């Protein structure tokens, strides 16, 4: 007599198959979910990378969303010129044209009365005259001696355009805006059949205690370093060189037991600013022992070695380093493509899916 399954047994087999199928689907789904943590000291470019993900992997910023950044563009522009004027007093730099002193006084009055999201023709005129002044330019060239937004020159050089009454910020204007990240900003997007969850965490010291609960189940960490920070001090601690702070932080992340199996991707960012700065500000400010030339290639390679040498598990853990310019969409697109390939190779090969 043949061996036949009872209806009950058949149901049990079907149930078992379904459970296996569900487990496999759950496994595949989990394998396709990528949790990325963006870490780094304050103003290293983390939030700009997040904005680029929206531009590259989503539809970018709509006209309506761009309009909402108008107030931030104006605020960044006004705060930048104010920071330069204040620094002139501290650094004892005179205006090239004595008449600009009246403009400076006017600037503080008009800026204080300015309505959010609006720039009057009078205020724009004052800022334009000040920015053209040789004393203001001399102070701008010494910006490493005080705190100034990276985007200062970008906005101030383009004042004619951004001061127009019908001005709508471009994607590039939005990328250049600076708003301090407080707390954690989460972004979702799909790329190469993977579902990314990217977490941007505030980099200032006061924000770092909020990181800890993000650590669980992280696929990869993108650690951002501003190359151009080598001759700057922290906004929150003027005794601390920004690059040294970044190295300390990278050391603690790279060698953390939480991240033994986590891919570490190092973005040496702001390469465009670094390339300009290294011509006039020597790397020995940050690394007194540096004996190389102040060329972009040699100085950048030296900084790369300083960070990669902090890795105490070189035999088992690789650091994937990329030189980036977070405001350059094509560069970020190219680098992120390479990063995704590393993630696929490292984190999904175990599942036999790729």
Curated annotation (Swiss-Prot):
E.C. designation(s): 3.6.5.-
Span list, region G5 motif: 324-329
Protein's membrane topology: Peripheral membrane protein; Lipid-anchor
Effect noted on mutating residue 3 to S: Abolishes palmitoylation
Domain of life of the native organism: Eukaryota
Phenotype upon changing residue 191 to Y: No effect on basal GDP exchange rate; mildly decreases receptor-stimulated GDP exchange
Residue span of region G2 motif: 173-181
Principal subcellular localisation of the protein: nucleus
Region (G4 motif): 265-272
Record key words, sorted: Cell cycle, Cell division, Cell membrane, Cytoplasm, Cytoskeleton, GTP-binding, Hydrolase, Lipoprotein, Magnesium, Membrane, Metal-binding, Mitosis, Myristate, Nucleotide-binding, Nucleus, Palmitate, Transducer, Transport
Annotated coiled-coil segments of the chain: none
CDD domains the record matches: G-alpha
Effect annotated for changing residue 345 to L: Mildly impairs receptor binding; mildly decreases basal and receptor-stimulated GDP exchange
Positions of Mg(2+) binding: 47, 181
GO molecular function: adenylate cyclase regulator activity; D2 dopamine receptor binding; G protein activity; G protein-coupled receptor binding; G protein-coupled serotonin receptor binding; G-protein beta/gamma-subunit complex binding; GDP binding; GTP binding
Residues anchoring lipid (N-myristoyl glycine): 2
Gene3D superfamilies assigned: GI Alpha 1, domain 2-like, P-loop containing nucleotide triphosphate hydrolases
Quaternary structure, from the entry: Heterotrimeric G proteins are composed of 3 units; alpha, beta and gamma. The alpha chain contains the guanine nucleotide binding site. Part of a spindle orientation complex at least composed of GNAI1, GPSM2 and NUMA1. Identified in complex with the beta subunit GNB1 and the gamma subunit GNG1. Identified in complex with the beta subunit GNB1 and the gamma subunit GNG2. Component of the TAS2R14-GNAI1 complex, consisting of TAS2R14, GNAI1, GNB1 and GNG2; within the complex interacts with TAS2R14; this complex plays a role in the perception of bitterness.
Protein name as catalogued: Guanine nucleotide-binding protein G(i) subunit alpha-1
Organism in which the protein naturally occurs: Rattus norvegicus (Rat)
């Amino acid at each position: 007599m043949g061996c036949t399954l009872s209806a009950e047994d058949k149901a049990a087999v079907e149930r078992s198959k379904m459970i296996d199928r569900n487990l496999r689907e759950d496994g595949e789904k989990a394998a396709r979910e990528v949790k990325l943590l963006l870490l780094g000291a304050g103003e290293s470019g983390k939030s700009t990378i997040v904005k680029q993900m929206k531009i590259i992997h989503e539809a970018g910023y709509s006209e309506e969303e761009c309009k909402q950044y108008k107030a931030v563009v104006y605020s960044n522009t006004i705060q930048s010129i104010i920071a330069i004027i204040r620094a002139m007093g501290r650094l004892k730099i005179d205006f090239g044209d004595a008449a600009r002193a009246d403009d400076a006084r006017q600037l503080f009055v008009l800026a204080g009365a300015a309505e959010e999201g609006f720039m009057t023709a009078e205020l724009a005129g004052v800022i334009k005259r000040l920015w053209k002044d040789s004393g203001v330019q001399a102070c701008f060239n010494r910006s490493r001696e005080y705190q100034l937004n990276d985007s200062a020159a970008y906005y101030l050089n383009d004042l004619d355009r951004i001061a127009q009454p019908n001005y709508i910020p471009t994607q590039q204007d939005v990328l250049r805006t600076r708003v301090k990240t407080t707390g954690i900003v989460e972004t979702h997007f799909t790329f190469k059949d993977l579902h990314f969850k990217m977490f941007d965490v505030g980099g200032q010291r006061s924000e770092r205690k909020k990181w800890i609960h993000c650590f669980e189940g992280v696929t990869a960490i993108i650690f951002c370093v501003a190359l151009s920070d080598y001759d700057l001090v922290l906004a929150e601690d003027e005794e601390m060189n920004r690059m040294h702070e970044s190295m300390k932080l990278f050391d603690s992340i790279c060698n953390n037991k939480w991240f033994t199996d986590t891919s570490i991707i190092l973005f040496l960012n702001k390469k465009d600013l670094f390339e300009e700065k290294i011509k006039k500000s020597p790397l020995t400010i940050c690394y007194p022992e540096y004996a190389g030339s102040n060329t972009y290639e040699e100085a950048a390679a030296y900084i790369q070695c300083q960070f990669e040498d902090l890795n105490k598990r070189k035999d088992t853990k690789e650091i994937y380093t990329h030189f980036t310019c977070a405001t350059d969409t094509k560069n970020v697109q190219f680098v992120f493509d390479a990063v995704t390939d590393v993630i696929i190779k490292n984190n999904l090969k175990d599942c036999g899916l790729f």
